[in-house]
Amino acid sequence: MFIGIVSLFPEMFRAITDYGVTGRAVKKGLLNIQSWSPRDFTHDRHRTVDDRPYGGGPGMLMMVQPLRDAIHAAKAAAGEGAKVIYLSPQGRKLDQAGVSELATNQKLILVCGRYEGVDERVIQTEIDEEWSIGDYVLSGGELPAMTLIDSVARFIPGVLGHEASAIEDSFADGLLDCPHYTRPEVLEGMEVPPVLLSGNHAEIRRWRLKQSLGRTWLRRPELLENLALTEEQARLLAEFKTEHAQQQHKHDGMA
């Protein structure tokens, strides 16, 4: 997969290219990340990339020419079929369904804004889609771009150590992940659930699904509103709710 980065701070992406899952993907040749800085496409001795906005107001905007030329250079390197994405608070909010959708593209170019943003005409002429990672303000598009890269890279075959990992991630099926445990078996009086030690794979699968449904109901109930639960899922969720109510009643009685 090819991902081009257009950013005033390309060195920030070493966190992606040099470390962790994405770093290994780059080393294996599964992920090709290249970057272009608009400063390299300026024509003045100060390497100016920003200017005042028409109509006044605070802050500066990224200028058209250096940014557009950097995008064109990234497009030329990517070849035909590259999708150009601008990381923006006005964009579609990134979720697991969106990540899965973006992962079907073999070529992405991510444009990272700075200052107060970019000239609207760049968005109109060069950008295919705008994406946001949430309803809050950041200093630039680099961190959202890294978030997008990390999440999308997990779908590239061979990137994860276990092919089921991406399938079983939180949100992969619209639910939060279940609790996980490793050694020791007992930690300060807290025991690993016995079912996980049983070796009964059918019961383990059932327990994990129940916990996933229950955790989603407790922490992100709005996610369940968009799901058509299977008969098994509905039954397991009902069991979880009953067990949770019993635990709450027991806890209240001890308080």
UniProtKB/Swiss-Prot annotation:
Residues binding S-adenosyl-L-methionine: 113, 133-138
Record field: catalytic activity: guanosine(37) in tRNA + S-adenosyl-L-methionine = N(1)-methylguanosine(37) in tRNA + S-adenosyl-L-homocysteine + H(+)
GO terms for MF: tRNA (guanine(37)-N1)-methyltransferase activity
GO BP annotation list: tRNA N1-guanine methylation
Tree of life domain: Bacteria
Keyword Endoplasmic reticulum tagged: no
Family classification: Belongs to the RNA methyltransferase TrmD family.
PANTHER family: TRNA (GUANINE-N(1)-)-METHYLTRANSFERASE
Protein name, as recorded: tRNA (guanine-N(1)-)-methyltransferase
UniProt organism field: Salmonella heidelberg (strain SL476)
Gene: trmD
